[in-house]
Amino acid sequence: MDSTLRRVVFFSNEFPSDDLKELFRRLDQHSKDRRFRLLSIFLEESTAVLKDEVSKFPRPLKELVPPFDSVLGLVDVDFRQGPLGAAMESSILTILELGLFIGHYESEDTEWDLVPGESVLAGLSIGILAAAAVALSSSLADVAKTGAEAVRVSFRLGVYVADISTKLEAPQSDGTLSSWAHVVTEMTEASVQDELKQFNTDTHSPELTKVFISAADKTSISVSGPPSRIKAAFQHSPVLRYSKSLPLPVYDGLCHASHLYTQSDIDFIINSAESVILPDRSVRLALLSSQTGKPFIAKTASELFLEIGTELLTGTIYLDNVTAGIVQHLQPQSKETSSWQIDSFRTSLVLRGIHSAVEANLSGEQRQLIRRDLVSWVNRDFGPRRPRSYASSKLAIVGMACRLPGGADDLDLFWKLLEEGRDTLTTVPPDRFDLNTHYDPTGKTENATQTPYGNFIDRPGFFDAGFFNMSPREAEQTDPMQRLALVTAYEALEMAGVVPGRTPSTHPSRIGTFYGQASDDWRELNASQNISTYAVPGGERAFGNGRINYFFKFSGPSFNLDTACSSGLAAVQVACSALWAGEVDTAIAGGLNVITDPDNYCGLGNAHFLSKTGQCKVWDKDADGYCRADGIGSVVIKRLEDAEADNDNILAVVLGASTNHSAEAISITHPHAGAQKANYRQVLNQAGVNPIDVSYIELHGTGTQAGDAVESESVSDIFAPVTPRRRPDQRLYLGAVKSNIGHGEAAAGIASLLKALLVYQKNLIPMHIGIKSEINPTIPKDLERRNVGLAMQNTPWPRPAGKKRLAVVNSFGAHGGNTTLLLEDAPERVKIQGTEDRITHAILLSAKSKKSLQANMESLLSYLDQHPETSLADLAYTTSSRRMHHNMRFGTSVSCISGLQKALRSQLDNPNFASEVRPVPNEAPSVILAFTGQGAYYHGMGRGLFTEFPYFRAQVQQLDRLAQRLGFPSVVPVIENSIEDTPSSPILTQLSVVILEIALARFWSLLGVSISAVIGHSLGEYAALAVSGVISTADAIYLVGRRAQLVEERCAQGSHSMLSVRASEDAIQEMLAAEPETALIAYEVSCCNTNQDTVIGGFQGEIDDIRRALEAKSIKCTILDVPYAFHTAQMNPILEDLETLAKAIPFKAPSIPVISPLLATVIYDVKSLNASYLRRATRETVDFAAAIEATQDMGLVDSKTMWIDVGPHPICAGLVRSMIPSAPVMSSCRRNEDSIATISKSLVTLYLAGLNPCWAEFFKPREREYSLLHLPKYRWNETDYWIPYIGTWTLDKAHLKHGTKPTTPFSVSMSRPSALRTSLVHQITAETVRTTTATLHTISDMQHPDFLEAIHGHTMNKCGVATSSIWSDMAFTVGEYLYRRLVPNTKDVHMNLTDVEVLHAQVASKTKGSVQPLVLRAHLDLSTSSMSLSWFNADGETGECAAESFATATILFEDPGAWRKEWARLAHLVLGRIEVLEQRATEGKASRLSKPLAYTLFKNVVDYADRYRGMDSVVLDELEAMAEVTLVPERYGTWHTPPHWIDSVSHLAGLVMNGSEASNTRDYFFVTPGCDSFRLLEKLEPGARYRSYVRMFPLPEDPNMHGGDVYILQGEEIVGVVGMIRFRRVPRLLMDRFFSPPTTTSVAGPVPPLAGATTKCHDIAQTAPALPTPTPPIVVSNPIVSSTLASKALEPAPLLATSSGDSTPKEPPIVTPAESERAGPVDNNMISQCLRLMARETGLEVEALTADASFVQLGVDSLMSLVLSEKFRAELGVEVKSSLFLECPTIGEMTAWIEEYC
């Protein structure tokens, strides 16, 4: 503070010439920065004062004040020009001047410098109130408090004056403001007073309304009075009429009117201010009166405000007096006064006059007049905002992801779609619902849609269930919106580089999810067709967010919001609010919409929301409604300061977000311009942004007449007003993404936001394609004049240098909600260019499946090929520190991009990649630290870590300070390599090694490595003991240093030496003893490092002799570079003193197990660790080898245990590897290698073993130098979990109100025409055809005459059973149909039907008139030339499709030429075998069967109808046979290939298995579960002759299974092959169980399982993690036939429930007398019988059926379970469920159960 400075602070009664709103915006923006803490407090207090005062208004006045959250809301032009605007001017001016005053000081960060006596305050009119707040303050903090009370007084004064004045003269009816004061120049006060007196007299003016002088000086006079009276006065007086006069901006009424106000008025204003701060406050600074120019005499605040109030209301302003008072104050008081300063708020005529007067009066002084502007600071940029609170923060969007129509499954594809101006309009795909039945443009069909159009995402059902820990059943039942919310949330988090817990802002407890969703199509339609366990968690909206939180383990809030069409952006707004409120630190937000339900189409259409003509025609004159769309989008949002601290990529910044409601609209669905504008103002005020600065708006833009008109009005009025107009360079561009991708409803807002974010990234506004004809005439006509319009072509949107672009995103809800988001550019990031010391970098990739890992590697390789400039360091940072890691892993350490590409290609080119890659274990392997001895010492050890990692450096320096305080030399020069390259003293050597090792151990802990045990080699044992907590770090350093001193003092250097010998201790002794010259040489074993690595010590000469002797025997020997022979007798002189020193040291139990090389054991307690231990460890042998063996013997170590060598060079690592060759060993440092590269490689090894290093710490020291790369997203291992809507029940329910019963959906669909209809394929229910893919769903009725006849042609157990040839024909039918849909000009389609697997036989119902539907789903992919097929049962009443398929297959579309070549090579072999069979039949060695005989043999299992009996004769020789075949000429229906023809040429294999003497057909029958392939070179011909040949053989992997190839020949040529057709042996007693007709058409139990059904052991473990108590048996005499699926046998039996719902198992039921013989107590005889029966049926010995033997291990699968349950019933009379063998998984549990219940 300059004591020689005289100062005046002048508070004007006029606003600065700047834009008032902009000044307040800047104040508001600065107040959110922690630099301006007091400014923020003042503005908040002032706002609170105004709200308090307004709350006291009477209702009529209160209604004139709009709601406001800050003063900024009251500065709008509309309000200031309103009825109360003028009255508020005084308080607004007070707030402005005080805010600028406070902000000036805070911007300069200067101390309070207003000193009483040296500083004086002055002001005019209302400005004196602001000055009064400063006069009452002794600090800037005081001004923030007193200022709010000054605002209160000014507010009350302004309102009071306005109220009194309006009683004198009413305001203009049109709202025009009139001035209450005029200024007259070039006249004296007396002459003006004479004219006014004459006017008042002549017009007989009442005293209250007279015109009077309110202010005067030498050059001007202010005349005040009611506006009309002033006008009349100037017209009445010729002198005034022709004088120079101007109206003043005084609109609030009359002040300075002694005739109007009395002391009671003043008391009412001042004394009712209800201040709690000011009564006891005294005046600190002189404040000059604007009437007298002298300081007010008041001593207290209340006195001061009364004086000021009196002057403002009754006193006249004399500016000359004010000027004189200022000049007098500035007169030099002493010779030390060097300058004068006048602080003001900009300049004005009054202020210039004061400046002139001061300069004139002080012109003779050799001093300087300083003019300081208190406004200029407000426009300065103070750098990045440092938010004062969460609410003051800007927000950063750091990640995003999407699934949008038009194939926009990622952001690049979405942008490409926008940039190309594509329209994604299409008709409703068949997989959603059938337009043939649900579309009626006339509107006559109830519940039908009147529009067929929409915009749909590709593959909505595809999902990686395994990744998200969901079973296929749960995934299928889970709403695709929820699934894709999970997927896009992950992708957005991945893009953002979020690793939960990496930083404080990403701690799982501080992450929340916010999603908008406005429909429940999947739950209400698709999943409701078969309500299952997962109906609620899979369909209820709350679970969408909850599932994200649960999967990622986020414990922040989880909100699912429905605000209709604005849901997505409203969810973002709520997320922003949560961030501003401090409820979360990271938010994931988005919108969800997947359309499936035709009901919603119908409802929206009937409400006239939807266009009947197509896409959303935004701003088009023909706009007729919106077009529906799918959409899923997710964004990740943080507070800006957190995003910058986390080194995130910031896509854009959110300045403000708000949602309001159109409460005043004409109807609930009609938009309201006023509400929209209010919302814009709220957002702009929240951010302190000028609407003119906004240059892009993404409209809600639905393409409705009302919506477009209202939004165009609201947008133009706020962002492009008529005045002030936008400059030519301030073009406002508009866009509407709905014209491209339709209206995504709940996802619409998030789609708009994603587009806006991409616009920021690409610096380009995509073309608007919504205007198809001409612009809508309801749009304002003057938009172009306002410089606003749609971007009709791709328009560059460059970022101005040094500035930020502003954009707005709108989203409105049909219910009346309006949500608006205000965005700005991300801060320009200047990447710190450091010196890249890291030469080697770790690149990591991971996945949850092998397929995904491979795809991730391929995508990264592709990315690198396309971006060869990629920084390896950035790539390493991104793939390690900024990724969530999974159990399938790839990792490598490389030094260049080309090296990485080579490593990736090497892995991808490996044909065994899939088999070699293995998931890391769920439980990471243990890690052991091995601390080396001093032999690894060298200068500069650990230097790279010391330089690069502050944490490591701090640890070394901390330990070094301890060493120095203990009196030892500093080791830092050794590590820095700043010491001379000369041999170091033992003290420095040993301390350096130990300190380095302790620091390294702590560094490994920092990197997230948990230690399981430690082992130290010689000197390294001190570090190991310190790290394990046995001794303190200081004690370890002390003992090592003192030991080294003792060695130097007591032991002679060079007298002894140590020799490392590559041989065992025994071998050395034997070799030395064998030679006379060495037999008596004395030496000691210092170390047994491994079984073949020994260190000996002794006198130097003797050790040299030993070395020569051993080397002569070709034994590798090395003299160690140590000055002493440790662990020998040379150490004896120090032992006593060392032990004495150690006895003073406290020893504690190890916190980490210590592996002792001295004791060759693992130490867990403190008993063995003491001073004596250290003495012995110094003197005795280091038996490292025995210690390692002990760890193995004790189970502490196995082949997977990780070993980290902690020391300057990996010596212990080599020893461990010698002892355990398979052990993974790593290094911390390595001589002549960059230590950072060494650590990096070790971390990769740990990572690949299953540990999760803390990569964030590894990159933390230089994180600012790295950039997060936007790499290709995770590649999902997806499966289609789509449940199609079957039938027309949404239409049929309309009949219920008429009392009519709707027909079943299936029968309705059967009656409709279909593009594909054959005898087996009856109706297409869904069809989607895209460029390279196609999907088809069909439905068929097995009771249809054609189908039923085909089934009854193949009967088993007197039941019609569908033969595999039926599935073959259906597959070929849909295969050719779909292929021709994609490749229409194909001449012939050749199909290879592969991987046919029939899990459950289909038995025709015997109920007449029943419906027995089945569904076939097919998906063709041209890129792989393959088509997958699945068959499902469906419910005959509801059309509900079963959750699981009963049969599957794959068709490969192949070149028949390859078949022909393949078969040509085989033909001679097959023909040769046929000839052999013929010859053996002729010789009587094989059986020749006639047609009747052959089919009679077949009747053992199957009875064929005549049309199926194509074999004319058969030659059968055990498991080999050939047949002559003639096909019946009749097709008997419409087929691709008639089943009776397929069966005729192929069922020879069935005859071999069921008719050959080689098969036990008495006890067993054989059925086929499928084949590997079925190919026909040409279509079978009616009446044609063929030959079939087959040779069956047992399959080694399954003794119950046979397989073989059936060759079909025409002449000498093979024309077809059924490859590896399989037959399973089934006990004949299960015939009834498998082949009985269903009694119901429910999908819950359509048919029994086919004998070929199998379940793997691991499937059992997955499906039944916990088993309930087994159900007791029911002992009955008659069999109970189960109709459950085979898979049901593997499910736990439900507990018996009581009527009250109790799930406690019931007691066994009472049995009938006939049953009672078996119902009594069961002795061990029953157990024995059960075990013998089981042994017989499984082929095992009874001895193998031990109590702990599991049925899985014994090979008791689902089929064997059925056999055993039947045998138990038939032979033992005990009825048990086959699931018993799952519920009781071991023999012991089963026998215990039998004892309990049998």
From Swiss-Prot:
Source domain of life:
Eukaryota
Which part of the chain is the Ketosynthase family 3 (KS3) domain?
A: 392-825
Q: What Gene3D superfamilies does the database record attribute to this sequence?
A: 3.30.70.3290, 3.40.47.10, ACP-like, Malonyl-Coenzyme A Acyl Carrier Protein, domain 2, Polyketide synthase dehydratase
Positions where O-(pantetheine 4'-phosphoryl)serine occurs in the chain:
S1758
Report which residue ranges the record marks as coiled coil.
none
Output the PROSITE patterns linked to this UniProt entry: CARRIER, KS3_1, KS3_2, PKS_MFAS_DH
PANTHER family reported for this sequence = FATTY ACID SYNTHASE (PTHR43775), NON-REDUCING POLYKETIDE SYNTHASE APTA-RELATED (PTHR43775:SF24)
Protein name according to UniProt: Non-reducing polyketide synthase nscA
| Species this protein is from | Trichophyton rubrum (strain ATCC MYA-4607 / CBS 118892) (Athlete's foot fungus)
